[in-house]
């Protein structure tokens, strides 16, 4: 074993990454097997995933094979998978490198055995009957003398020849044949598309719209007639605006289309007899040319359809391109959902614990807090009102003080005399004989010298008013 881990020049053992090995195995499996048919029992089926995809296993008594059906394929299946049902699966083998598993990507699924088909048929019949698709009151009356009859059947079988022959003998009229496969995996879908196509034809168009539709097929086993038990066929007949006659199999053969059709004929010949009331000759040449044209068109379309399918098989499908991302997304989605559930449970337990810790004291505290907030708001409003009131009173006092200020008197032209001791001189007797006197004006001060000029200092002396003395009194 050490030889594989020793990096010497002599070793020839190649080194691969895990992704390279997984990719190589994936290519080998897909290129070696391609499409396979696998018979097995469905195990582990739990319905469709949230994304619409289906995951389960196919098993027998010795082995198990993982299987997946993408949503687009699941919607086209004729029957829903069930736990324990034995089926035949058709698909491609591939691997899922994320978990080193190999699986089959199923593209077609069918049950094995008549018993399984009968069980599936009864379940489908009950489901459609519960929806009211088989009610007799909802069936449409057949026209007495249709101008054009549309026939949905195989263009090369004996059924169409019997219908054409019988209608031609009774009443020659215009017959429209919509060629379909009456047996196989695609027969049900083709019949449903044909019914919808007849109803979609416009009146007065290049292709005339029929007044009556006949869906016909010869007899066969339950598996051969299974396409006419398709739910899409039943719903197409129910939704058809044109009356429909079913003529599938022999008189003892019953399919779901017989329950929903407006009239059931025991045989295709009986359908032709019910569709037209009289018997006339049909021009053989026109019938022969019509049959040759239909067969030629059928061969032409079959050839080009097979060629186109060969080209399509070489292209990767959307499901193949998105197989791995879809699988990874589904796994991540499942983990995310589980994680969300766990997180919610933890939070719920946490909040439950907090709820148990709550007490009436906390509620009283909350009530006191609300009261405190209310008192604070009221105190704030009272404080604001008091401040506004004091501001108004202060403004009144300020205006009164300003009106009594001596500065206002000085502005009117008066002078304030101050003695040497800087005291106000109010009377003449206070005037000093010598020294400096300060005179204060409105816009400044000045000093003057006091001299005695023999002024009469008597307080009772009269002041002689000169002609130039027009100054008013100070007080």
Swiss-Prot record:
Where is this gene product found?
Cytoplasm
**Record carries keyword Plastid:** no
- Keyword field: Cytoplasm, Exonuclease, Hydrolase, Nuclease
What Enzyme Commission number(s) does the record list for this chain? 3.1.11.6
Give the domain of life.
Answer: Bacteria
Which terms in the GO cellular component ontology are assigned? cytoplasm; exodeoxyribonuclease VII complex
One Pfam family name is tRNA_anti_2
Q: Which CDD domains match?
A: ExoVII_LU_OBF (cd04489)
Q: Which GO terms describe its molecular function?
A: exodeoxyribonuclease VII activity; nucleic acid binding
Q: Which GO BP terms, alphabetically?
A: DNA catabolic process
Q: What positions belong to coiled-coil segments?
A: none
**Region (Disordered), start-end ranges:** 452-475
Q: Which family does it belong to?
A: Belongs to the XseA family.
What function does this protein fulfil?
A: Bidirectionally degrades single-stranded DNA into large acid-insoluble oligonucleotides, which are then degraded further into small acid-soluble oligonucleotides.
**Assembly information from the UniProt record:** Heterooligomer composed of large and small subunits.
Under what name is this protein listed? Exodeoxyribonuclease 7 large subunit
Organism in which the protein naturally occurs: Bartonella quintana (strain Toulouse) (Rochalimaea quintana)
